[in-house]
Amino acid sequence: DNRYKQNYYAVNVYTDYSHSFGKHNGKVLLGLNYERYNQDNMWASGTDLTTEDKPFLSQTQSNKKNGDGYWNRATAGYDGKYLAEFNIRYDGSSRFLADKRWAWFPSVSLGWNIAREEFFEKLSETVNTLKLRGSWGQLGNTSSNYNSFWDWYPFYQQQAISSASSNWLINGEKQNTSSLPSIVNATMTWETVETWDFGFDFGAFNNRLTGTFDWYSRTTKDMIGPAPILGSVLGTNAPKTNNCDMRTSGWELEIGWRDQINDFKYGVRFNLSDNRSKILTYPYDGEFSNQSIGGYYNGKYLNEIWGYESVGLASSKVEMD
């Protein structure tokens, strides 16, 4: 039997209020989002049935993910020169157990449009926009490395049952067996992605020439990393844990030009970026027999290639000795 079904539902609702007085302006937004995901995937066949009196399949599972979020955003500005924004989110995910399911995530950003200042008037006809900005914020991440709830929480529903699969005989016949799932980590919770960002936007020649530049440092705290390898005497795998911190630093540059010749409009855009990810902390550094180039090592960049340094080649037996 082979069956597959997938459903995804998403609802976003928000309301806002704006008010201006003099050179001041402000805006407040309130919103919520609601997501439901359900996947049913089954392939099954049966041989050596323990009994034919119950012709049905057991231990079937579905993969469900639910997420709810509530957010608030407040913005304020003065004369198009000074800008501020504050955000707060309260997110919940069914990927975590009940007491670890919800968390708060704030962020704040500031901007300064220098092109609106009086001391910039001499250049304002050429440079229409020159905005400096900076921001700090946190977002929650549920980790994209493990898609199934059962990958995270292998409860008894995943206990495997096999017919006539034992390695020993009783009365000349192999016996039915069951195997325990992995250990459950009841403390697993959100990964917190904390980002610092500094950059500027510019526009010149009536905004025909535009560009942005950003430098950022993004730290993923309590990242769900590889579990340690435990002795085979345990009989199962170690549970996944929030055991790793990683920092990604990089920059992004974008420059564009758009113009019109008679009725012909055209535009070009150039993008350039670079970033590197570095493992800050990982408690099982160097303890895995299966660590490879893609493994986690404290203080090393992700996917960095490194190894032993050569001290030279021996050209005689004396040097070998």
Task: Give the positions of each predicted feature.
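Short, intrinsically disordered, charge-balanced linker/junction segments flanking boundaries
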Residues: 316-321
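Extracellular/periplasmic, surface-exposed regions of secreted and cell-surface proteins
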Residues: 1-309
